[in-house]
Amino acid sequence: MTHASSAWFLAAVVIVTFIVVRHIRSSWRKLPPGPRGFPIVGNLLQLRNKQWLTFTELGKKYGDLMYFNVAGQPLIVINSLKVATDLLDRAKFSDRPRNIVASDIMTGGMFVAFAPYGNAWRHMRKAAHEGLNKNIVNQYHPIQIKEAVLLANDLLAEPNRWVSHVRRTAASTIMSIIYDKPPTSEQDPSIKRINDFATRLTRAAMPGAHFVESFPWMLRIPSKYAKWKRDAEGWYAKDSSMFESLFHSVKDRVAEGSNHPSFAATLIQGAGRHGLTDHENSWLAGAMYTAGAESSSAAMSWWMLAMILYPDAQKRAQAELDKVVGRDRLPAFSDYEHLPYVRAMVKETLRWRAVDPVGLPHRSTEDDIYNGYFIPAGSILIANVWHINRDPENYGLDAEHFDPARHLDGTGQLAQVAGTKEENHVSFGFGRRICVGRHIANDTLFAVIAMLLWAIDIEPAKDEKGASLPLDVDGCIEDGVVVRPLPFKVKVTPRFPEAQAIVEQERELLGHY
């Protein structure tokens, strides 16, 4: 190569390098706006408890699409429905961030909510949809009505234990739907073991729970030298045994022809279509229970708080129940279409206090440009569900308040809130990752609300002087993913003289748990 040609070659390399570097820097300069972070840790120290409130406040300054650097990990926070829909409904944003301990080790990659976007997830999702879709969930209505009756009876008998009664109802309802198990107490060994699993999994998935999430090379450490790894592997073996035992008990009943409708039975009967092994089906059924029980009890708890804070909404729902159902019988799903305000109350409960106010995170698998902003591949994306559900542009200036009527039209029938999605809220998530059990959740909440408001009045508890006990409306308990209200007391009384007798009579017909 001559001196001249070498010079031209060197010049070409410099020009190409300049163009590439400029392009890369240009892309990163177009990152969405966000707060300045600290060296090394970036914005990590700014992401503390009640992140949804932090994101809402920062959104006032930085807008609907914000960028955070979390110790080198790009984090994109979304504060509007349009942006969330535009991004999270697309395949390239349907992955989940990798969680080495919670997903890879403790659940063997088979916990569907954490599973990466790929063929294994698609098979599990298809099987879950087959067992929980809108056209099949009506077979679970008798279970939901039965549990609602038991809850009404328990609240009338022991109102001071309402939290325990609500948690039992949620756990028993979902256990019956998933595994065809009869109503049980909250202390039932199966429920207790699965609840313990959910607690362990949630703690393992919390940011900062394990150093290996930030230093993946630690995964190569042999188990005998890494207690965190031994523990996770041990729990995977024990939890696999637990879920397989529950699943095989249903499989035995299916073989005998003695089973009732259940999600596990649907998996067994459709095994040839979706190609999952018994081990995979066992974990899928376990995941559906884990996701459903805690979120349902949290939603019921927020609704109880709303009834104390907004007595006019309670009275309007009761008036509708009196008109449609009367006082001689209990409400049923046959009344569903004729109770638009009660159904609106379901939607409003899930909008007003989403049990997961920041949603499960998504992950981008490719670079993307949105509205001129660069979103790098591998970014974690979070939708600020709390703020989106309270956006005044969609829900009005009173979006902070509980008002089921916002979901009704001028004739009192259910209507689509302008600018929102099908559910009139985004608490079930987005796109391919939308909650597959949302129809069960809606129906369970409908049964509970209709039954309780037919039978009882819910009021604030009083002190010895007759004054209402104070409530911490803004406080909450963060159980990992699920958020529930701080403990509070309620006053529960029969709504009319015959109500308690009718509930007790129905409970006797249903049997005890």
Swiss-Prot record:
Signal peptide: none annotated. InterPro entries: Cyt_P450, Cyt_P450_CS, Cyt_P450_E_grp-I, Cyt_P450_sf, Cytochrome_P450_fung. It holds the Pfam family p450. It is found in: Membrane. GO terms for cellular component: membrane. Belongs to the cytochrome P450 family. This is Cytochrome P450 monooxygenase ARMGADRAFT_1018418.
